[in-house]
């Protein structure tokens, strides 16, 4: 494995791990950083699937007690059954819209200008949601009903626009629909499991021919491990952070980063308009 290729794999593994579960858009950061370091083409498509699996494994491991508790409790515990139903209800809207529009969105919207615009708009919405007074109806994920799940699932569909952020849309959706900050964040993590596994499986099947080159295995392995490690650090850090802070810091980061991309484009510093994810 070439040194620069290993460095690219490491950088993008770090980016995926740190941004996947923070409300700042992992896809948006991947598109922008990959373009800056010149990592693209078919190898990049396959690589992105692999590093997403690393991030998924991290959140499953971090919440393993809850995950295994739900699985073991499904046959007999109403709480586990209700939680599973809520998760499936929240997952379905993304499945329907993803199958219908994924290719169109990837073709037309996977570029840094769309990402930057979505980062700014999403940041403004996040600030509004945090400052808006709302009554907390749900303090823990086990208190949710199917209506909460459906609304959050619909909010997650906004994340099909790169730069919006899957975790950002579900967390802010949860806050607006009556969940506490902790409950909204945890449900976002749980919802990521079926959503990301489904997306990775769909993309993996669609691009299955890209995995026939065994020479890329060391690159994929490095990206997977790095993504897993940094995703676990990000999940733990976010849970500690939101215990005593709002999401305003992430909102301002989104706005600043998005405006920086748009400014460099307008000034001609970087020709983002021709870049593709």
UniProtKB/Swiss-Prot annotation:
Highest taxon of the lineage: Bacteria
Record-given protein name: Undecaprenyl-diphosphatase
UniProt KW keywords: Antibiotic resistance, Cell inner membrane, Cell membrane, Cell shape, Cell wall biogenesis/degradation, Hydrolase, Membrane, Peptidoglycan synthesis, Transmembrane, Transmembrane helix
Residue intervals passing through the bilayer: 53-73, 85-105, 108-128, 183-203, 215-235, 250-270
GO molecular function, one term: undecaprenyl-diphosphatase activity
Pfam families membership: BacA
Family under the similarity heading: Belongs to the UppP family.
Subcellular location: Cell inner membrane
Enzyme class label: hydrolase
Reactions performed catalytically: di-trans,octa-cis-undecaprenyl diphosphate + H2O = di-trans,octa-cis-undecaprenyl phosphate + phosphate + H(+)
Keyword check for Electron transport: no
